[in-house]
Amino acid sequence: MAQFYSPNRRVTTRKAVPAKNLTVTVASLDPFGQGVARHEGKTVFVTGVLPGEQAEVQLTEEKRQFSHAKLKRLLTPSPQRVEPPCPHFTRCGGCQQQHAEITLQQSSKTAALMRMMTRETGIELSAASLIAGTPYAYRRRARLALYFQAKEQRLLMGYRQSNSHDLVDIKACPVLRPELEALLQPLRDCLSQLSAVKRLGHVELVQAENGPLLVLRHLDPLHPADEQALRDFAQRQGVSVYLAPDAESLTCLHGEEPVYHVAGLTLAFSPRDFIQVNDAVNQQMVAQALAWLDVQSQDRILDLFCGMGNFTLPLAQRAASVVGVEGVTALVEKGRENARRNALSNVTFFHQNLEDDVTQQPWAAQGFDKILLDPARAGAAGVMEQITRLAPKRVVYVSCNATTLARDSKVLLAAGYRLANVAMLDMFPHTGHLESMALFLHDTGMRKAQ
């Protein structure tokens, strides 16, 4: 995922090496958007270069089998090199690939996904589908760090530099939805005037269907005058404002509960709930999952790691019944609320840690025609055997980590499923992050014979 600010993110500082310049020709991009070159038999990863380019680079890290380097001087530019529109690119750690044409980014990510799946499963895939939206103005959620610079007596608001704790003060961010980018300067001005300006942690911006909202993390109780200043800001800018005095609490200072739309449904969510950052790709992803599952009116469908119902509720519109299983209690409650909101009575949500033994759970004994799962980066190792025992005709696996998708795929393949389709989801353009989804089919005759 893009290296947007996270309060818990650990930063590793690489060991410095003596300055050494090389001239290399870049052969390809790695999955994270770094250029890959060879020098004296060793692989060299270079940030900021593209395939076909010749460049003078400086080594920053040396290992036995590979080195890292930074670009010093571009000797032969690629025709696929473009001018980054962001004034903070190369300093900000949020985006890594704005210098590359979007088609090159997408083809490199797709190739990386295919290589991973082939290496782990042994299956030669002919092609992967591409699901993508606009490369800019797509991000409907971001978290920005806040830091009061005592020497300059000013508030910094922005993202971390790559591989650094240093904060880049952001004046523009073209990957943000325009409604959120337009808030950057007025929000900075407002926060700078608060008496608590030295005790602010971060601010989250979210673009909901019913308007933008912000969540302000403050380290001390706010003075009533500060709260009133935030209310005035909210009214002037037409935003909802939430206060977060700690990691658990959340108070609405002004505005209404946010909602988003998917597959013609309206889903309410808490500002801290997980929703997909890229709305356009989420819409296409849900539509593709429904098409791959080939949902019929008589189907019973299981949705694992279901969240608040991003897939569950669109499935329930089409199937006879749907069961959603999720490990976060608040999301289960929100899923039930959203089912009621959309008048869907054929869906049942269960709270269950899917990393535990699930065989004794009431939903695990039910029969299902089709299964969808959308786990976190760790994958779904704990439930893959249970999925094969349920023997659904179709399985759609949505993944934010191609490595665990490939690993878990082997369980399905060993049980007689075949990998019928793979798609690369460009959820985060200009970053090294890719998401993916895969369709597995089980031949009925083979299943009966087992």
Swiss-Prot record:
Biological process (GO), any one: rRNA base methylation
Broad enzyme group: transferase
PROSITE patterns listed in its UniProt record: SAM_MT_RNA_M5U, TRAM, TRMA_1, TRMA_2
InterPro entries for the chain: 23S_rRNA_MeTrfase_RlmD, MeTrfase_TrmA_AS, MeTrfase_TrmA_CS, NA-bd_OB-fold, SAM-dependent_MTases_sf, TRAM_dom, U5_MeTrfase_fam
This protein's UniProt keywords: 4Fe-4S, Iron, Iron-sulfur, Metal-binding, Methyltransferase, rRNA processing, S-adenosyl-L-methionine, Transferase
Keyword Methyltransferase: yes
Binding site for [4Fe-4S] cluster: C86, C92, C95, C173
GO MF annotation, one: RNA binding
Record: active site: C400
Residues covered by the TRAM domain: 15-73
EC number: 2.1.1.190
Catalytic activity: uridine(1939) in 23S rRNA + S-adenosyl-L-methionine = 5-methyluridine(1939) in 23S rRNA + S-adenosyl-L-homocysteine + H(+)
Amino-acid positions noted as binding S-adenosyl-L-methionine in the UniProt annotation, renumbered to this chain: Q276, F305, N310, E326, N353, D374
Family to which this protein belongs: Belongs to the class I-like SAM-binding methyltransferase superfamily. RNA M5U methyltransferase family. RlmD subfamily.
Function per UniProt: Catalyzes the formation of 5-methyl-uridine at position 1939 (m5U1939) in 23S rRNA.
Protein's UniProt name: 23S rRNA (uracil(1939)-C(5))-methyltransferase RlmD
Organism: Pectobacterium atrosepticum (strain SCRI 1043 / ATCC BAA-672) (Erwinia carotovora subsp. atroseptica)
Lineage summary: Bacteria, Pseudomonadati, Pseudomonadota, Gammaproteobacteria, Enterobacterales
Gene: rlmD
